């Protein structure tokens, strides 16, 4: 292995043995190199040692595995990883369950559902509420809630309860007072019970099951001792993205003296609150470990960028729950380059002029630049202006664009809207997980209206309500129609980036003079041929300007980054009907006699303020 020069702080991390260690690793601090070398040092000290390296995204786990295999020559020592574990947190849970199926109460042959498969089973369980004879108590609770909520709103409440079940929301609802909460609890328990039974009959597990059963297994003292003895190093990357259940599972791998634990993370980069990731989990664990290290030398960005980041973020982070640790630039400055520019633009078109100038006068390749958007909704003006300027842009969901199921579902929507007789396309759109119309409902609608569209538009589904404004417009702009699908933050999170890529293609075709039907025909042909359009990232499209959301850009690097639309205020996420916090419990928002949310509810006002504060804190971390 070639010799790598480490910073003094990196060397401390590599050389720390025999006591629990927490590492706060700032952006661009050489974290992955440090972790690989720590594993190398472990095997150098004792070739028979074993390590478990856990990360929280497929991308980071794959990158870590690739670098470990290359640097440590693991492939040449009796297997792909020679007994070491390098995997995501859900991969870790699956491995635990597979090795200890009997303790988990399973047979060990269970398969793991994809998100779409789990969504389908859940919808089938929910459909029992509408199409089967219900126990009297369940029927009463259902009718009570339907008097208060629309069907779509109730489905959203049930989905939210399901997503929070692992974290104790049912217990919190049990302790809540009020008939509304009790009715929601009873209905949720009924649907969840049938969902669980459906999975058991099929021999399948979802991601929540992986965490739940792994937690059960790791309660066994013998299992704990076996793993604690087996793994001489438990290395946890991206720990700022963990939730309490995942943290508890990992902690069971740790020896009583904590000598085999090294957790790495950066609370300033915790941006997965919607998955119940909690930055406080990382901070509390760090407080329990005796050895604390800080990696804040930045080897990635120019000094001017680091200075600007420190100047802005030190002030921004002052009132937040995360302490800001300034980065120290280690790259050589370029005296001929101003690394940070502020562009005061009168309109988006001026951005296109500026980018062209960078290409023509400063020889900056387009593929070295990226435009970052805070969100998709409301920012299409930037893309329209860039396209109108003749700048080729590359946006999409990454990978093979037309193989993304969300792209296919949205294309089916356009095909159906173009011609209502394309019922199969309409059904494909309606049953998409982010739309969520059940097969039984679709079948019922087809019996009443073979073309489906009119009944869907008459429903109280939020997408239907958004689309209804276009139902009598034969000349509707397809790009505008696409953007109307982004009715809330949840749907934007699910399909926003895929829709952005498709929207860009629609705009390109429209500027060529193609009408709605011709645009749809071109898109359908591309989808049916599965044209292998590779979007960025990766790989980058030569000669094209990349457009990403801030959230989608995490973990990527570009020589030139353009942040747009930062002058506007950060919007808090839409206030949920069911508020949740693992410490505060739950609160179900009240309704008045007309079914509207009570405007003057002091209790809900406190929850809204709390949600706004948390959303603002995460927006700061996303900006960093």
Where are each of the predicted segments found?
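C-terminal accessory regions
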Residues: 434, 541-545, 551, 594-624
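P-loop NTPase Walker
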Residues: 1-107, 179-180, 197-198, 202-208, ...
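Helix-hairpin-helix
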Residues: 430-447
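Conserved helicase/translocase P-loop NTPase motor core
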Residues: 86, 90-93, 184-233, 245-249, ...
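Active-site-adjacent bridging/hinge elements
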Residues: 96-98, 185-189, 284, 529, ...
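Conserved SF2 helicase motif VI
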Residues: 576-581, 621-624
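ATP-hydrolysis module of ASCE/P-loop NTPase motor domains
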Residues: 55, 78-83, 102-184, 292-300, ...
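Conserved motor-region signature of P-loop NTPase helicases/translocases
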Residues: 1-66, 70, 116, 124, ...
């Amino acid at each position: 292995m070639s010799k790598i020069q480490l910073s003094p702080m990196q060397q401390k991390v590599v050389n720390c043995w025999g006591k629990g260690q927490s590492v706060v690793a700032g952006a661009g601090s050489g974290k992955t190199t440090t972790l690989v070398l720590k594993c190398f040092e472990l095997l150098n000290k004792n070739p028979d040692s074993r390590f478990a390296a856990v990360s929280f995204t497929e991308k980071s786990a794959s990158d870590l595995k690739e670098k470990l295999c290359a640097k440590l020559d693991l492939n040449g020592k009796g297997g792909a990883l020679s007994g070491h574990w390098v995997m995501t947190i859900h991969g870790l849970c699956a491995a635990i369950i597979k090795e200890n199926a009997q303790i988990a109460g399973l047979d060990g042959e269970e398969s793991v559902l994809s998100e779409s498969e789990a969504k389908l089973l859940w919808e089938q369980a929910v459909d029992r509420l509408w199409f089967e004879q219900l126990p009297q108590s369940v029927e009463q609770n259902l009718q009570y809630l339907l008097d208060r909520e629309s069907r779509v709103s109730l489905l959203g409440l049930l989905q939210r309860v399901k997503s929070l079940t692992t974290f104790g929301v049912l217990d919190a609802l049990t302790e809540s007072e009020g008939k509304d909460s009790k009715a929601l609890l009873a209905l949720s328990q009924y649907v969840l019970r049938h969902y669980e039974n459906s999975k058991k009959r099929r021999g399948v597990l979802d991601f929540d099951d992986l965490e739940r059963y792994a937690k059960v297994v790791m309660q066994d003292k013998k299992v704990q001792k076996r793993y604690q003895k087996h793994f001489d190093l438990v290395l946890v990357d991206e720990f700022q993205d963990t939730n309490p259940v995942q943290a508890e599972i990992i902690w069971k791998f740790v020896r009583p003296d904590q000598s085999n634990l090294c957790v790495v993370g950066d609370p300033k980069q915790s941006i997965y609150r919607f998955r119940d990731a909690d930055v406080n989990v990382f901070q509390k664990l760090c407080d329990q470990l005796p050895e604390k290290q800080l990696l804040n030398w930045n080897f990635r960005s120019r000094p001017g960028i680091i200075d600007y980041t420190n100047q802005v973020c030190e002030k921004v982070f002052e009132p937040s729950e995360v302490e800001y640790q300034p980065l120290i630039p280690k790259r050589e400055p370029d005296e001929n380059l101003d690394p940070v520019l502020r562009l005061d633009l009168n309109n988006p078109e001026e951005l296109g002029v500026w980018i062209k100038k960078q290409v023509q006068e400063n020889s900056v390749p387009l593929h070295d630049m990226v435009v970052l958007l805070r969100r998709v909704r409301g920012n299409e003006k930037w893309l329209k202006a860039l396209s109108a300027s003749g700048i080729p842009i590359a946006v999409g969901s990454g990978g093979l664009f037309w193989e993304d199921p969300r792209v296919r579902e949205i294309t089916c929507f356009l095909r159906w809207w173009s011609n209502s007789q394309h019922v199969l396309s309409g059904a494909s759109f309606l049953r998409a997980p982010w739309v969520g119309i059940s097969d039984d409902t679709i079948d019922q609608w087809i019996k009443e209206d073979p073309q489906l569209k009119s009944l869907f538009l008459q429903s109280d589904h939020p997408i239907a309500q958004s689309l209804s404004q276009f139902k009598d417009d034969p000349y509707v702009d397809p790009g505008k129609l696409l953007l109307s699908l982004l009715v809330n933050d949840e749907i934007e999170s699910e399909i926003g980036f895929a829709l952005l890529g498709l929207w860009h293609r629609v705009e390109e075709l429209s500027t060529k003079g193609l009408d709605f039907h011709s645009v749809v025909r071109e898109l359908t042909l591309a989808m049916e041929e599965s044209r292998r359009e590779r979007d960025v990232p990766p790989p980058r499209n030569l000669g094209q300007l990349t457009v990403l959301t801030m959230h989608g850009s995490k973990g990527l690097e570009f020589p030139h980054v353009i942040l747009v639309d930062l002058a506007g205020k950060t919007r808090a996420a839409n206030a949920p009907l069911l508020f949740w916090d693992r410490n505060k419990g739950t609160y179900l928002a009240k309704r008045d006699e007309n079914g509207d949310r009570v405007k003057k509810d002091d209790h809900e006002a406190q929850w809204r303020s709390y949600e706004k504060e948390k959303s603002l804190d995460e927006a700061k971390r996303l900006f960093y």
